């Protein structure tokens, strides 16, 4: 199983108060991996990334998506070495690309 698929399985198991829809889209590049729906009726997108180093690899299309849709979009990054999870706001995509996993996150772990 690919690392991002494993991360999705962790999310689905750990965060049950959100309805998750996995987006399998090969026709519109840059579309995030997940669409979340909260009990309050709010939608948001979540891009899943897994890294072995500080660098977080995002395609130009993924960066463009978060630049165009900075609100209610997030990027969840798992560091394989430490197992640490960090959640970043989509509006911080340029900072995430520049600073990598060392960038301060808006949230840590799946319990937050």
Where in the sequence are the language-model features?
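Acidic-basic catalytic patches of nuclease active cores, encompassing PD-(D/E)XK
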Residues: 1-25, 39
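Structural signal for conserved beta-strand scaffold positions within catalytic alpha/beta enzyme cores
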Residues: 22, 47, 75-77
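Beta-rich catalytic cores
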Residues: 30
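Conserved catalytic cores of phosphodiester-cleaving nucleases, focusing on short active-site segments
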Residues: 34-36, 42-52
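Short strand-connecting beta-turns/loops that link adjacent beta-strands
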Residues: 39-41, 80-81
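Mg2+/Mn2+-dependent nuclease catalytic core
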Residues: 51-70
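Nucleic-acid nuclease catalytic cores
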Residues: 67-92
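Intrinsically disordered, low-complexity terminal regions enriched in charged/polar residues
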Residues: 85-112
């Amino acid at each position: 199983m690919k690392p991002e698929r494993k991360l999705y399985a962790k999310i689905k198991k750990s965060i049950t108060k959100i309805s998750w829809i996995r987006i399998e889209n090969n026709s519109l590049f840059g579309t995030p991996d997940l669409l979340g729906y909260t009990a309050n009726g709010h939608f948001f997108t979540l891009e899943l990334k897994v890294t072995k180093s500080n660098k977080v690899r995002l395609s130009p299309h993924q960066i463009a998506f978060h630049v165009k849709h900075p609100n209610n979009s997030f990027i969840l990054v798992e560091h394989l070495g430490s197992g640490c999870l960090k959640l970043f706001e989509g509006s911080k995509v340029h900072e995430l690309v520049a600073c990598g996993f060392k960038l301060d996150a808006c949230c840590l772990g799946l319990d937050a």
